[in-house]
From Swiss-Prot:
Gene name for this UniProt entry: HSV2
Chain ranges passing through the membrane: none
Localization in the cell: Vacuole membrane; Cytoplasmic vesicle membrane
Similarity-based family: Belongs to the WD repeat PROPPIN family.
Lineage, broadest ranks: Eukaryota, Fungi, Dikarya, Ascomycota, Saccharomycotina
Cited InterPro entries: PROPPIN, WD40/YVTN_repeat-like_dom_sf, WD40_repeat_dom_sf, WD40_rpt
UniProt note: domains: May contain a beta-propeller domain involved in specific binding to phosphatidylinositol 3,5-bisphosphate (PIP2), leading to the association of the protein to the membrane.
Protein name as it appears in the record: SVP1-like protein 2
Annotated source species: Kluyveromyces lactis (strain ATCC 8585 / CBS 2359 / DSM 70799 / NBRC 1267 / NRRL Y-1140 / WM37)
């Protein structure tokens, strides 16, 4: 049953969301605005901290600790903020506009321009390797760094950052992921698989991170589209995907029998008819001007989609009917994100 908390107007000109992201286990959401940054518990949705900070742009938090990283909107400065001490513990001048920012207990990874910079988290604070040239797409989680190739944008590199080794960035694996440029990469929580999609948006592929072997190839649809976000379930068994067709798809990674296939798959030997489709999907109701969202898994069968333009968080339940052997998605709750 869908329950609704009060919905705020679509346009928030006075205090728009500048940036937002979930922490590493997706249990918290951090949001920056022109006035402050705020941290929320994702489920149930509740603001747990607010800090006046009119200069915060791109922002990330380290697990559920007191450490927050953000980039100034006025200057290319990376701040590491200690929320217990209510002060910066360090600042670093950057060379270009930041595309993305990733935190672990050992490293801070910053993608800016056409390079990735890696810093050691702690004291002393220093850059620990030469900048890595890349093709504009990257992800860092569980000590693994995945980034698109500088020259062939359909290929990705997967490498592990070594904390104690003399060579921080290992040799890694080169994966030929797509014919078109890679749009997005997502690591699962174990770090043994990476999901990729291209700018074409029709196919999502899953590869093993240790050897680059293709595990699954999913078809989102036939028409070209742009993938907005995709995330792994906590146990790594499912992958949720939202595109600008504004449909939420859920794919089964381990049990391929659960994914749908075309009725002509046994009759026509064409790749399209052999494709694996999502186990279920949900058509999202999107208002005019909504062009962004992010997914978080709150359990292996529960999801949240955050809509920054509308300041809303929708909670979904993934259900299974044992008698009919079918999955379906149910919208359970819609909450306002208070700022």
């Amino acid at each position: 049953m869908l329950t609704r908390n009060p919905i705020v107007p679509e346009n928030h000109v006075s205090n728009p969301i500048v940036d937002y992201e979930f922490n590493q286990d997706q249990s918290c959401l951090i949001v920056s605005t022109p006035k402050s940054f705020d941290i929320y518990n994702v489920h149930p949705l509740k603001r747990i901290m607010s800090q006046e900070m009119p200069d915060a742009g791109t922002i990330r938090m380290l697990h559920r600790t007191n450490y927050i990283a953000f980039v100034s909107t006025k200057k290319e400065l990376l701040h590491i903020w200690d929320d217990v001490k209510k002060q910066d513990i360090t600042r670093v001048k950057l060379d270009a506009a930041v595309k993305d920012l990733f935190l672990s207990r050992e490293f801070i990874v910053v993608s800016q321009g056409d390079v990735i910079s890696i810093f050691k988290f702690g004291n002393p604070w220093n850059k620990i390797t030469e900048d890595i040239k890349f093709g504009g797409v990257c992800e860092f989680a569980n000590g693994l760094l995945v980034y698109s190739n500088e020259f062939n944008l359909g290929q990705i590199h997967v490498t592990r950052l070594q904390t104690d080794a003399e060579q921080v960035v290992g040799k890694g694996v080169l994966v030929k992921a797509h014919a078109n440029p890679v749009k997005m990469v997502r690591l699962n929580r174990k770090g043994d698989m990476v999901a990729t999609c291209s700018q074409d948006g029709t196919l999502i592929r899953v590869f093993q991170t240790d050897n680059g072997v293709l595990v699954r190839e999913f078809r989102r649809g036939l028409d070209r589209t742009s993938i907005i976000d995709m995330r792994w379930s906590p146990d790594g068994s499912k992958l949720a995907v939202v595109s600008d067709k504004w449909t939420l798809h859920v794919f089964e990674v381990f049990n391929d029998a659960e994914n749908k296939r075309h009725v002509l798959k046994d009759w026509i030997n064409i790749k399209y008819f052999q494709s694996e489709w999502s186990i279920c999907n949900f058509k999202l109701k999107v208002s005019k001007g909504s062009n962004d969202c992010k997914i978080a898994w709150i359990s292996d069968t529960g999801l949240v989609i955050v809509w920054p333009n509308r300041r809303l968080a929708d909670t979904f339940k993934l259900n299974y009917n044992d008698d009919e052997h079918v999955w379906w998605l149910q919208l359970n709750q819609r909450n306002e994100i208070p700022l």
